Regions:
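A contiguous, surface-oriented mixed alpha/beta subdomain in the mid-to-C-terminal portion of proteins
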Residues: 241-243, 248, 256-271
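Conserved phosphate/anionic-ligand binding catalytic regions in large, soluble enzymes, centered on
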Residues: 62-75, 334
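Active-site-facing alpha/beta catalytic cores
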Residues: 2, 7-13, 80, 93-249, ...
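Conserved, mostly hydrophobic/aromatic
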Residues: 66, 272, 338
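Acidic (Asp/Glu)-rich catalytic clusters
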Residues: 54-57, 87-91, 135-144, 230, ...
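Internal helix-turn-beta structural module
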Residues: 312-357
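N- or domain-start disorder-to-order transition segments that initiate the globular core
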Residues: 14-54
Length: 362
């Protein structure tokens, strides 16, 4: 009788699973690509700088800038090499962190990122994707450029989170309980985007939830299933990315959100996403959003502490042809501004911060 019951359980299990493959334990990649002393020190320092900006102890602007997603490590390294001197040039006014996104949430289906499908050919070599991602993060941080990423699941952070100086929870997952729990345990600052419908309450609720301790299921560095107990993350904040009803980067919208933040007892300031619904999904409009935000900052507003920008070597986007990108340094997901505009944008942001200092010092 007992044997019959076991057979019934097995017969009804995994009925829609095609196959299950083994994944490398995190420790295998952490040992293969360990963080150098230089990289570890950079991450620690950048996290500290981000903390100070978020908590109003540093008047510089936190700038998350880089490709919508990474599909070509070579182009990502070139981007990092170009960004490094600008990070140094504007260090007194901007804390620049490179956007290094390996995972893409999809509204329906599509390429889910370098970790999920590193060869862009639907082979889903996730072990290779994890290797490539960690090696790239190691290389970028060793260059002296800190990295930022989006977190989509409870396991991948064990492979890459030690290289992340800042993290994001996207608009589609901000309301998710498990992502709030994850954010509560991440060692870096985490931004929650407002909902795709433009609502900000879910993001504010998420911040409150992530500040608290949680227990959730994940894996250890050795790949064993585990119960994770977190301390809570005091470095969470909101990202305004616009919504179905339009942008929310203008001064009036920012003031409304800041009023809600202040009611919750937190510092009333926000990060602005220049892309997505704020640019009406027209990549060149990121420059218009930048100009508006710079005007707010230069006028003395302290309600904006950070910005996000989708930027690449070559402007626009491209579709894959036979599983290959035809244009080097151009996005295969959301369209991005090109390098020339990126340089202009960073200078404008720096000038705005300098102007704000003059206004507020009088």
């Amino acid at each position: 009788m007992a044997k019959e019951k076991i057979e019934i359980v097995v017969a009804n299990d995994d009925t829609r699973i095609e196959k299950v493959d083994q994944v490398l334990p995190p420790i295998a990649l952490l040992e293969k690509y360990p963080a150098s002393e230089h990289a570890a020190a950079l991450v620690k320092q950048t996290r500290h700088e981000a903390h100070n900006i978020i908590h109003g102890k540093d008047d510089r602007l936190l700038v998350i800038i880089g490709p919508c997603s990474i599909h070509d490590p070579k182009a990502a390294i070139e981007y990092a090499n170009r960004l490094k001197p600008l990070r140094e040039k504007y260090k007194d006014s901007l804390e620049i962190i490179m956007r290094v996104y390996f995972e893409k949430p999809r509204t329906t289906v599509g390429w889910k990122g370098l970790i999920n499908d590193p060869y862009l050919n639907d082979t889903y070599r996730l072990n290779d994707g994890l290797r490539i991602a960690r090696k790239l993060l190691s290389d970028i941080n060793d260059l002296g450029v800190p990295s930022a990423g989006e977190f989509l699941d409870m396991i991948t952070p064990q492979y890459v989170a030690d290289f992340m100086s800042w993290g994001a929870i996207g608009a589609r997952t901000t309301e998710s309980q498990v992502h709030r729990e994850l954010a509560s345990g991440l060692s870096c600052a985490v931004g929650f985007k407002n909902a795709t419908n433009g609502g900000v309450k879910v993001a504010l609720d998420a911040i409150g939830a992530a500040e608290a301790p949680h227990y959730f299921l994940s894996v250890t560095k050795f790949g064993h299933s585990a119960i994770v107990s977190t301390k809570g993350n005091e470095d969470c904040h909101i990202i305004l990315r616009g919504g179905d009803k339009g942008p929310n980067f203008n001064a009036e919208d920012v003031a409304k959100v800041c009023a809600d933040i202040e009611k919750s007892g937190r510092i009333p300031h926000v990060m602005i996403d220049f892309s997505h619904a704020n640019s009406c999904k027209q990549f060149k409009k990121q420059m218009d959003v930048c100009q508006d935000v710079c005007n707010q900052i230069a006028s003395g507003s302290k309600q904006i502490f950070g910005v996000m920008v989708e930027s690449h070597l070559v402007e626009g986007r491209q579709d894959l042809v036979d599983g290959k990108a035809q244009t080097y340094g151009q996005s295969i997901t959301d369209a991005c501004i090109g390098w020339e505009d990126s340089e202009i944008l960073l200078k404008q942001l720096s000038d705005a911060v300098i102007a704000r200092r003059k206004v507020t010092s009088n």
